Amino acid sequence: MHKFLDGAKSEILKYDVISFDIFDTLLLRPFIKPTDLFWYIETKYNIKGFHQARILAEMQSRKLSKEQDITLDEIYHQIPKEFHSYKEVEIATEKEMLVPNLEMLELYRFAKENNKRVIIVSDMYLPLEVLEDILISKGFGGYTNFYLSNHIMLTKHSKDLFKHVLKQENITHTQMLHIGDNSWADGTMPKSLGIATLFRKSVLKQLEEVFPKYKTFTPTSVAQSFILGSLCVFYKNYIQKHEKFDYWFLLGAMQAGIVAVAYCQFIYKEIHKRNIDTLVFVARDGYLLQKIFNILYPNSYKTAYVYAPRILKKAVFLEVVESESLEILRILEGEEEVKKKQITTNQQAYVYLYSNFEHCRHLALKCLDNYRRYLYSQNLEGNIAIVDTITLGYSSQGLIQKALNKEVFGCYVDLLRILNYNCVSFLPFSHPKPIYFHNWDFMEFLLTSPEYPILNVENGVPIYQKDVSSCEKYRSKAYEKIVEGAVGYASYFKESQISLGIYDVIEWVNFFIDNPSIQDQEQFKQIYFLPDATHKNALPLFCNDVSLLSCILKPSQSYGILKRSLRTNKQERLFKILSLIKKIYGKLKKK
């Protein structure tokens, strides 16, 4: 960005008159295509058919017109009567959604500061007074003249508008520099008249140069158009401006930020229907979600971040399985007491728990009482809703309900089964299998915390796992950057968020999962996830080490890793082959 700005400023100093295009140059829409604005209006106001009718009306108006350009009034003259009243809505929506291009704002101000004659030259159907109002409100005031195609009825596209500009400004072509994004209207046409040009690709093209895989992403909803369009604007105005090129920061904005914003929108709608006083974000999944919720809906609800580790719930409810017995016993007895008893394995702990069940039940009640005091210290007032991501056993909701001795409401991204709990799911429980995240562990990675795994809460303080691995330390550091990116994105677009549905988010996340770049694969080499309650058994989030050779030598182990991890296209084929072999082997074994 700075290289372009330095070169552009040098060019500006050479000329007397600096001309700027408006759309995709001075002003940016957070959509992939200009016509997606009409799609947004149709969706927001629930006016079926407006999107297509507005496009067709403009096409018909241009076909009938004998002039080089048309006005907004002429377009609405061709639209069906039921849509006539939406002309003012379209204008208001443009004003609401348009964002200044900060790179161009810097050049615009530089030109004025150096006493250049700044003019606006644009092909556009919106009325002159509307565009003048928008430009001033976005920081582009103080220009000398405004040459608008639908006002003069000459266009840049035909180059006649540029001829008109030279005449009106009383200058030669050598005195003028034009800046724009359209290769024909802002490049070829002025150049044919000898006018110098400064071509700057659209923000979408600039994003695609950095992230080539998004060239193949095709939005299937206006929300998805907004997702990619808003990220283009964010990348342009925030990331490049602040030189935030860290991979995890970008992932935070482009994945975690999108998911968190969508889920928080859902949470707000759901608890708004209910008499909720306090919103409890459960650690660790609620860490980022609380930050995003407070950005989007400040002061709307009291929020708290509360620890309710799964292993603590198992200890309190004495839900003992051998593989977790040692951790459960440490919670109940205390680590020093377990050492004194010389219990060092899960098997020993399992035997002890069942041999001393009444004693352990007493310790579990004491543990619950300690946890209750912790919750009371958080001042959780009135009716409570908890926020978590996914649940099978409702561990956090069950633990908090047990400790507070009252029902709490639960918000989840997904429910793996329905039990007798008062809750709601972002993803409908009856969802068909194909409509789902291709790798839930990636979602868990996006919605978590930089904290290490939590085992217990003592005296109001979380007790973190001590013997954390190097990969967990790496994940923690990476996630700090992810939080920065997600919070940055949510803060930037908090005023102009449109509703993002669960299926919009699923398609967006799955596109990333299914199309990992070489950079993605490289960065994820050190990222592991911990699927069990003890947080001991780490698995790679991206199966970098699974090759054809490993599939041949260790087919069962390779299958297990591939099943849980993000897969490249090559690994996807290996996984299908292993799945088929496993299926055939299973049938032969039955015989």
Where do the language-model regions lie?
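Substrate-recognition "cap/lid" segment bordering the active-site pocket of phosphatases
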Residues: 119-121, 125-175
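N-terminal accessory alpha/beta regions
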Residues: 53-74
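Short, surface-exposed acidic
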Residues: 45-57, 80-92, 139-148, 173-175, ...
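Active-site neighborhood of HAD-like aspartate-dependent phosphohydrolases
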Residues: 6-53
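Nucleic acid-processing catalytic cores of prokaryotic defense/repair systems
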Residues: 29, 38-42, 108, 124, ...
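Short, acidic loop-to-helix structural element flanking the phosphoryl-transfer center
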Residues: 67-120
